[in-house]
Amino acid sequence: MTTIAIFGGTGYAGSAIRDEALGRGHRVISVTRKLPADAPVADGLEFRLGDVHDAALVESVAAEADVIVLAIRFAPGGSGDGELRLADALPSLTAAAAKHSARLGVVGGAASLLVAEGGPRLLDTPEFPAQFKGEAGSAAEALDALRADTTGADWFFVSPAAAFGSYNPGQPTGKYRIGGDVLLTDESGKSEISGADYALAFVDEIDSPKHHRTRFTVAY
């Protein structure tokens, strides 16, 4: 049994990863700033209130976990909206992960993926919606910070397909494809994956590690 601590375990991706992990018999510590009224009750599931920017909390959770999962929205931060950049939380996360020999898995975004070999990034294309550039840029910034990490933490960053989110939950198929830094599309040009199949790929990486200190992407 693996102990998995999920920051953002009540969100769209985090809850899917939580449920997949619990279904495999793992212990899950779900860290959230506010416990939802409909929080599930399950064997092996524990909720803790807290924030990923609390370095002391990160340290205590890392001491118990085999894997730390960061599944929190990449708010732009620094814009007066009261939200901090997730990149600012990464130093304490990587340090704690390295200290306690825990893996660090990050739910990333698709916008930092290249649209084809040689670029550009999806984020940098003219068609990319302006209203999402702040969040997408924050996710890309976090990936850059991980790539520059010097703690030696064993991290992995999983970029989903372009059409991934609660607006497009899809249906579980039990299948997915893995790529590297280039956006994956199907034969009709669509880039999609359901929440359940993204979680399947994420927990497969936890159970059978194949990616170390790198980003990979999953899609149909």
Which ranges hold each PLM region?
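Conserved catalytic-site region of short-chain dehydrogenase/reductase
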Residues: G77, A111-A116, A163-Y167
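Substrate-positioning beta->alpha
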Residues: S138-A139, G189-V203, T214
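Conserved beta-loop-beta element that borders a ligand/cofactor-binding pocket
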Residues: D144-S166
